[in-house]
Curated annotation (Swiss-Prot):
EC numbers for this chain: 2.7.7.-
NCBIfam families associated with the record: primase_sml (TIGR00335)
PANTHER family, sorted: DNA PRIMASE SMALL SUBUNIT
Active site per database record: D97, D99, D274
Membrane-spanning ranges: none
Record-given protein name: DNA primase small subunit PriS
Family, as annotated: Belongs to the eukaryotic-type primase small subunit family.
Enzyme class label: transferase
The entry's keywords: DNA replication, DNA-directed RNA polymerase, Magnesium, Manganese, Metal-binding, Nucleotidyltransferase, Primosome, Transcription, Transferase
Disulfide bonding pattern of the chain: none
CC terms in the record's Gene Ontology section: DNA-directed RNA polymerase complex; primosome complex
Necessary cofactors: Mg(2+); Mn(2+)
Length: 324
């Protein structure tokens, strides 16, 4: 049966937290650090106004959620000495937030603010690329992937990055998402050296992301400083990138126009993740295992991203029991 992504009623929330939710489904990386994290709750659908909560053990967290049956539950990516005051910051997870409704190059026909199976699959593709860069280029290993209900969170707990400043996190985002046009003339002494020629490091990553973005452009896509004719030419010749024929693609577009396109692509790439989330050391994120009440989906720790399907693995039982 198809799954309709509509809000959960108060009764459905009650059923979910009474019959289905289990505190043991909260990931270990959160349960093992409960006393260092701030928790926040949205009880009425107006945002997480109930903040500064701390739980000393699983039992107290379980009791609170079972009784309150919140519209949404969150916990901090930060670790504190005094989480109930958000004081004594120790470190923060490095996080990437990919929301399917905010992908700038969506290939679906969803209305603004809505999501569907197609754009959720696209969000999953993006998360896989982010994970590969984090593990391949940065050598990070403690990478946790979470389905948030309308997208994905990538939560990194390697100690090497958890004490990074907001500024450094911004630089990491630029690298990971290929959102800065490489300036190769200064580094290598050539004025016309193109990133697609260099098969390693950031130039390789930038080329990979640029290819992904260009192949997902549509006629309706809006690119800064790219007019309709140039966009049509990009769409006409982008099949060359399937075979990584960047030189021919650049030649067909023209060097000056090509540079305009690549500058625009880098700015689009910056919008693939929510940068504000990544650089905010005190951000709270949806608590995995809890309900995303706006779409009636479970936020879920993903064990195998390649086989994960939110419409099989993150749908609460009450959704299948609906009569309307």
């Amino acid at each position: 049966m198809s799954v309709e992504l509509k809000p959960a009623s108060k009764y459905e929330r009650k059923i979910f937290y009474k019959e289905e939710w289990n505190v043991k489904d909260v990931p270990d990386f959160i349960r093992n650090s409960l006393t260092s994290r701030e928790f926040g709750f949205d009880h009425y659908g107006n945002g997480p106004n109930d903040r500064y909560k701390v739980f000393v053990d699983d039992l107290r967290l379980k009791r609170f959620i079972k009784v309150k049956q919140p519209f949404a539950a969150y916990c901090s990516v930060a670790f504190y000495d005094k989480p109930n005051q958000r004081k004594g910051w120790q470190k923060s997870e490095l996080v990437f937030d990919v929301d399917a409704k905010d992908i700038p190059i969506r290939t679906c026909d969803c209305a603004e603010g809505e999501v569907c199976e197609k754009c959720l699959n696209q969000a999953k593709e993006i998360v896989l690329m982010i994970r590969d860069v984090l593990s391949g280029d940065f050598g990070l290993t403690n990478i946790n992937l979470i389905y948030s209900g309308r997208g994905y969170h990538v939560r990194v707990l390697d100690e090497d990055v958890m004490d990074a400043s907001s500024e450094l996190r911004g630089d990491i985002i630029q690298y990971v998402t290929g959102s800065k046009l490489p300036d190769l003339s200064n580094e290598y002494g050539f004025n016309d050296l193109q990133p697609f020629i260099i098969p390693f490091g950031y130039p390789k990553n930038f080329t990979r992301w640029s290819k992904y973005t260009i192949l997902h452009l549509r006629r309706s896509s809006k690119l800064d400083d790219v007019n309709n004719q140039l966009l049509r030419d990009v769409l006409k010749h982008r099949n060359l990138l399937q075979e990584d024929l960047w030189g021919m693609f650049r030649s067909n577009i023209g060097p000056i126009r090509y540079k305009k396109v690549m500058n625009a692509i880098s700015r689009i790439n910056m919008q693939i993740t929510d940068t504000k989330v990544s650089i905010d050391l005190k951000r709270i994120l949806r608590l995995p295992s809890t309900l995303h009440s706006k779409v009636s989906m479970k936020s879920t720790l993903i064990k195998n991203i390649e086989t994960f399907d939110p419409f099989d693995d993150a749908v609460p039982k009450f959704v299948y029991e609906r009569n309307d």
